[in-house]
UniProtKB/Swiss-Prot annotation:
The gene is mamL. This is Magnetosome protein MamL. It comes from Magnetospirillum gryphiswaldense (strain DSM 6361 / JCM 21280 / NBRC 15271 / MSR-1). GO terms for cellular component: magnetosome membrane. Keywords: Biomineralization, Magnetosome, Membrane, Signal, Transmembrane, Transmembrane helix. Disruption phenotype: No magnetic response, no magnetosomes, no iron crystals of any sort. MamC is mislocalized in a few punctate spots throughout the cell. No magnetic response at 30 degrees Celsius, a weak response at lower temperature. At 30 degrees Celsius magnetosome vesicles are smaller, sometimes align in a chain with the filament, only a few have very small crystals. Other, possibly precursor magnetosome vesicles are visible. MamC and MamI mislocalized to 1 to a few patches in most cells. Deletion of 3 consecutive genes (mamJ, mamK, mamL) leads to cells devoid of magnetosomes or a magnetic response.
Amino acid sequence: MVRVIGSLVFGGLILLLASSNAHMVETRFGPLIMLAPHFVVLGITFFLGFAIGIVLVFANVMKRRKHKLPGKNIVIKR
């Protein structure tokens, strides 16, 4: 987990250093207006979509665990 966070921070620093020469794009998220380099905005939207996909997969896995087959839950006591 620490490696993943560290690599994301390192990648973010590379993006910030590389963004000094990129053209700026104004992006509006409702009331929030963000002025950022174009590829940074594309990266943010990509990673947000990736994170939403991971959350949906985990939600489906948790639903499957809750809905086990009825035969496995029946215990016959004698």
